[in-house]
């Protein structure tokens, strides 16, 4: 992985919710101005190739921007590989539990869109599959590690997928199948937004995932021209307008 954005959020989170006993059981909330509120919660799932050293804080600028544009935003933490409760299936269960907590938060709208970046995009698509969260409004996957088989074939980020699963595909085929949204039925409307010049999650990862979809699957994809892996989470980059438009379109289409 290259570098993560270190730009601080101009406005800090309004509150932080603790959802369990581990340091990963937490999410930060940014609220929109009342006159701009859309009645939709966006739950951000950060990337970092499922590794412990990357946390939610690099998505704070995106959280602030989305709140300024009218969304209630929860920036999720979750258990990554090497942490208590992390690895597979723990990482998936951690994200699903955090999203469920956001959905149940009485101060947030019940309509929840999961927006994940990179490894978080993989997790957003995973939650949107196999009827895991029938209450979820939609999923927006930004530069997602969508096909774990292709991620492993390319050896991305020093074989990050094997680090997540804890084994090679031939040694744990059922675990790989459970973790891979490319091998599961999509049951929640989803959008993929990728950067034209993404070297961290190459286009073949997106293409191989899309090749597993049927014409009836509720998904479409868009490419941010000129964007790299991190431009799709940078509110100061032109790609942000595309990301915002896709979130808006998804929430309107599923209303």
What are these regions (language model features)?
Residues 207-210, 214-255:
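C-terminal catalytic histidine-bearing segment of alpha/beta-hydrolase fold enzymes
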Residues 53-63, 74-110:
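Catalytic nucleophile-loop/oxyanion-hole region of alpha/beta-hydrolase
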Residues 1-35:
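N-terminal cap/lid segment of alpha/beta-hydrolase-fold proteins
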Residues 34-37, 42-65:
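Short, surface-exposed "cap/lid" segments of acyl-processing enzymes
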Residues 126-171:
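Hydrolase active-site cap/lid region
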Residues 186, 192-194:
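Short beta-strand/loop motif that positions the catalytic acidic residue
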Residues 199-205:
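Conserved alpha/beta-hydrolase "acid-adjacent" motif
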Residues 116-126:
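Glycine-rich nucleophile elbow surrounding the catalytic serine of serine-hydrolase chemistry
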